Regions:
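Short, structured segments at the rim of ligand-binding sites
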Residues: 1-403
């Protein structure tokens, strides 16, 4: 794909079938589980770059492992290789990945008995990991910065000789930890999650079984955004069902007041364009599903819908500073907003949104996909659209079928 994508003004009609990618969060958890526990197998790996890089990192005999731009990939691979005695690995990624925080996980693993050091800048990748036999079995945290750090520990917990016991005072994005625990329980692990603690019993061999994966609810958010901005929508998504391990399943509830209807069938989910139901100000807390923030807030911008959305404290630490990206987009559209460390609120909207100049994806897959539906309102151009390959490689192919 060319580095600059031109999106002409969209017709506003969406009708057809979209096969969403497999959820990379579940897939990456499943890869670690399959690597650590031989009776569990994973026969399907998504095409998402994050998942492919993790697969390579888990199977490679090379010392130096390149992990692309995936924060989850780095954190899970770090935990895995830390538990593999008599191995030496150096993990690194893109400049953006090497700038993302990792110290909380490294400190936790080292406290358990791992041997991890920094090759370059302190508290950042590249990481030098000398695989070790983990000897300790308990840790206490204050306020955790990322649920992914905790999830990485949960995945290796059953492989430790004494299991693992963790406590904490505060945990962001708890829904992702709940997803991990539910997945592990479903696969037969003995794990107990309470409000501020989790206990994992050492793994014992069980009946062989294959791990199955769900379609990605977070990817649906961008089609919900498109439906909300469309004049007519009838989209079918095979494989999405009303019961899911993913917290992002709540996307349907968040978009319903913005005119997005849905119906489940035995085969999947039907999205439709309904009358916009919202009145007054939309007030949401997205702490448990921050990956929905870009699509949801961009939709509010486009519809000039008043909103107050909190639970955004992790947005600055994603692939880009997503909170700042939203503030910048609002300014370009002529929208006045108020941002705090944890929230974004609309103050006033112009009578007509200002046209947008060339947009940068900022190396963020979700930012790129959240910008695409704005072409329902105006022509759009975007630099480096190929970044969507991180989680949804076929996004532009799917988008083009409705252009």
């Amino acid at each position: 794909m060319d580095e600059l994508l031109i999106l002409p003004r969209h017709s506003g009609t969406l009708e057809g079938t979209v096969e969403l990618p497999l959820n990379k969060s579940l897939a990456n958890r499943a890869q670690i589980i399959a690597a650590l526990y031989p009776h569990l197998t994973l026969n399907t790996i998504p095409e998402a770059e994050d998942s492919r890089f993790l697969a390579q990192a888990l199977s490679s005999a090379q010392r130096d492992l390149y992990l692309g731009a995936g924060g989850t990939t780095l954190r899970f691979a770090t935990a895995y290789w830390a538990t593999q005695p008599n191995t030496l690995k150096v993990l690194s990624g893109t400049d953006a990945l090497n700038s993302r925080p990792i110290a909380e996980l490294v400190d936790a693993l080292n406290a358990l008995g791992a041997d991890i050091t920094y090759e370059g800048r302190d508290q950042h990748p590249p990481l030098r990991i000398c695989g070790a036999s983990i000897t300790h079995s308990s840790l206490a945290f204050g306020t955790l910065k990322s649920s992914q750090f905790l999830t990485a520990l949960l995945l290796i917990g059953p492989a430790l000789p004494k299991g693992l016991s963790l406590t904490w005072e505060s945990l962001p994005s708890r829904s992702y930890v709940e997803m991990t625990v539910a997945m592990m329980k479903e696969l037969g692990f003995d794990i107990t999650l309470d409000k501020n603690s989790v206990t994992i019993v050492p793994y014992t061999a069980a009946t062989p079984r294959e791990i199955t994966l769900e379609r990605d609810w977070s990817a649906l958010a961008f089609w919900c955004e498109a439906a909300a901005l469309s004049t007519s929508t009838s989209l079918f998504f095979p494989g999405l069902q009303p019961h899911s391990l993913q917290g992002d399943f709540k996307v349907l509830d968040y978009f319903e007041p913005l005119g997005v209807g849905h119906t489940f069938t035995s085969d999947g989910l039907q999205l439709t364009k309904n009358s916009t139901l919202a009145y007054g100000k939309l007030v949401y807390n997205l702490e448990q599903c921050p990956d929905l923030a870009l699509a949801l807030i961009t939709t509010c911008f486009a519809l000039r819908q008043p909103f107050e959305i909190s639970g955004l404290s992790t947005l600055p630490y994603k692939e880009c500073d997503r909170l700042q990206a939203l503030v910048d987009l609002a300014e370009e559209l002529g929208i006045s907003v108020k941002a705090t460390d944890n929230s974004l609120s609309s103050i006033s909207y112009p009578e007509k949104l200002a046209p947008l100049g060339p947009q940068s994806s900022r190396e963020d897959h979700r930012l790129a996909m959240s910008l695409a539906p704005l072409s329902m309102l105006m022509p759009l151009s975007m630099e480096h659209p190929e970044v969507v390959a991180k989680s949804y490689p076929d996004f532009w192919k799917h988008w083009d079928q409705f252009s």
